[in-house]
Amino acid sequence: MVSARIVVLLAVLLCAAAAVASSWEDDNHHHHGGHKSGRCVRRCEDRPWHQRPRCLEQCREEEREKRQERSRHEADDRSGEGSSEDEREREQEKEEKQKDRRPYVFDRRSFRRVVRSEQGSLRVLRPFDEVSRLLRGIRDYRVAVLEANPRSFVVPSHTDAHCIGYVAEGEGVVTTIENGERRSYTIKQGHVFVAPAGAVTYLANTDGRKKLVITKILHTISVPGEFQFFFGPGGRNPESFLSSFSKSIQRAAYKTSSDRLERLFGRHGQDKGIIVRATEEQTRELRRHASEGGHGPHWPLPPFGESRGPYSLLDQRPSIANQHGQLYEADARSFHDLAEHDVSVSFANITAGSMSAPLYNTRSFKIAYVPNGKGYAEIVCPHRQSQGGESERERGKGRRSEEEEESSEEQEEVGQGYHTIRARLSPGTAFVVPAGHPFVAVASRDSNLQIVCFEVHADRNEKVFLAGADNVLQKLDRVAKALSFASKAEEVDEVLGSRREKGFLPGPKESGGHEEREQEEEEREERHGGRGERERHGREEREKEEEEREGRHGRGRREEVAETLLRMVTARM
């Protein structure tokens, strides 16, 4: 009788072993099932013998539930066109989110070289409305940086865009021909000049040692955000637009032979590029014909007179100055050439370890470029919060979407209804601050931070400071302070009036450049784009390999399970 019971028990346990082994083998074909099921079975071996059958049954039940959940997800993914559209929409939102992660900041790699030669280059930022819908307000403007090597010459051309330039480094000569009149002026660091659309313009770097670097914005007039260069003098490189006229038109226009025209405008013409090498004698001759640029406010002011030539910004009295920095500004009042374009130009020099006082512009869109120094900027942006809201529905559709959302929010420092976009600033970085958006720039502890700013829609713009002397919050009346801050007006006054400096303040006190290291880490992650995605993919690949190895040894595992159950029965006997 006892032997019969033992035989029955042995048969039951062998059937259970076969069922568990079969279940484990089936699960081996799923992404996470095989190796987890195997671990579950191995844990059961450590249990007392009378608990092991129940443990094995629980392993099987867990795997069955996981398979059903995976099947539901797969069915949802294949549930038809609507589901596919949702998936595509989610992917599109994700791509847009990655693309629009920081729409206001552009490092050197964001610029595209449109001119490249041995003697220099011209780099241009792509149209703002292609970067983000948030930048449509300045879609008519482009940012460009010209670099010309010592003793180089930029051949004459005209464009269908107004050019407003700031000489960030070096010196040279700029010539414009407008209304039949040629004007040549010397330019140097700190000069601001305007080259109108359609005016033939050329320039030369007359220095024998330093590069000439000009930062400029182009105000497009034909197609918003698009501009073209037109080279009259030229040949093969650059190609002269004159060569595109028919031969008969060329001969009639210049009253000369086709051979001579070919030598000037055709394939036998100039082929050294847009920026060419000039001799010392040639640059000296160009300089000899140029008058000294850089007039100041002693020139007749509008409406009594017009500006002639560049405006020497750094030779003027700074509008704000203290031990933490200086701000130099030129607007339509001081430099009449800017009036037509509704643009002001400024230069900020922030002392090492200091920062600009938090502020916002009431009307202007700030387009900024860093020629020298290092630091970081913070821009407070409510639009980023609303964009994040578009992803709310993703949060209920899977853990992976939630993790991506949380990761993005951490990188962009979500605040109380706002996002703070932090950007590391270094030479060649450009950034944009829309009207009304508070921002601050901080210089590193190792060097001053220099920023050139072009402020679009400058007419009647006001800089509103949020800290330091004359900050707008101090001007609230006592009742408004008490109600707004939920504190006593005296305490509010004490905090808001703690800084006496205007415009520039001492920087954060954290030692060791913690903020800069944090920003470098964020940008390193952003440069690698989907680093987290690649790590996840790598984990999946490793799990798959482990799964395959376990699959190859599946038969041995089944035998181990059966052997374990036999040992259990034998021990009981």
Curated annotation (Swiss-Prot):
Residues of this chain annotated as glycosylated in UniProt: N349
InterPro entries: Cupin_1, RmlC-like_jellyroll, RmlC_Cupin_sf, Seed_Storage-Functional
Disordered: annotated segments: 65-102, 288-315, 382-416, 498-573
Disulfide-bonded cysteines: none
PTM annotation, UniProt: Three protein-processing steps occur in the formation of the mature protein from the primary translation product.
GO molecular function: nutrient reservoir activity
Signal peptide stretch: 1-18
UniProt-listed SMART domains: Cupin_1 (SM00835)
Propeptide intervals in chain numbering: 19-86
Limits of the Cupin type-1 domain: 104-262, 311-493
Keywords: Glycoprotein, Seed storage protein, Signal, Storage protein
Acidic residues bias (residue ranges): 403-413
A Pfam family hit: Cupin_1
Domain of life: Eukaryota
Biased composition (Basic and acidic residues): 390-402, 525-542, 549-561
UniProt keyword Glycoprotein present: yes
Similarity comment text for this entry: Belongs to the 7S seed storage protein family.
Protein name as catalogued: Globulin-1 S allele
